[in-house]
Amino acid sequence: IPADMLARMRAEVDDLVARHPDVRPELLSGAHNPWGQSAKILGSQAWLDFCRFPEIVDMVEQLIGPDIILWGSQLFCKPAGHGMAVPWHQDGQYWPIDPLATVTVRIAVDDSLPENGCMRYIPGSHKPRSVVAHEFVEASNVAIRQQVAQLDESLAKDDALYAGQISIHDVYLIHGSSENRS
C-alpha cells in the first residue's frame, strides 16, 4: 500500500475508534459503509475507497475472476495489552454467500507480528474446499464466538505483516490469532 494511503488509513482507524467508544475496536465491522448497518457502525467513504484500490482489486480478480463485489469489512484493531483473540475458524462458517467463491483481503495498517497477535493459519487447510465442524466458544474475551472443533495447532504458521503489506486468503483456510500481549 502506498505510504500516503497508509497514512490516511491510520487516520481513518483513529477516527472510527474515536466515533465509537462504546464498541471494542476488534468488533468494528462495516467501516466501508458510510450509511451505517445493523451494528450502528457509521463508516466512511474513505474506507470504501480503500477497498476499491485498483492494485488490490486486480489481485482479487486474478484469484476469483472479474465478478467482484465488496459485501463486508472488519477492522481487527487489537489494543496493546488487551486486544481480543480470534479463535481458529474458517470465514465460510460465517459468511452468508453461496457459493463460497470469495476471499479475504487483510491490510496491515500497523505491523501485525506474533508478539501483538498476528493472524496464524493451518497450511493447506483450504484444499478440501469444505467448511469443517465449528463449536460455540463460551469465553467473552474473543472477537468471534465459534471455533474449529478439531485442530492440530502444532501445524500453525504465522502470517506476519508489516504496515502497508497485504495478505489474501481463501474462505476455507483455517486461521485465527492470539490476543495482543505487547
Where are each of the predicted segments found?
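Non-heme Fe(II)-dependent double-stranded beta-helix
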Residues: 2-97, 134
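A structural signal for well-ordered alpha-helical scaffolds and beta->alpha junctions
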Residues: 53-57, 102, 137, 141
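A short, structural micro-pattern
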Residues: 69, 99-101, 182
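Short acidic/polar capping segments at secondary-structure boundaries
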Residues: 75-82, 92-93, 100-101, 109-114, ...
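Short, conserved beta-strand element in jelly-roll/cupin
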Residues: 89, 96-114, 160-163, 168
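Double-stranded beta-helix
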Residues: 112-178
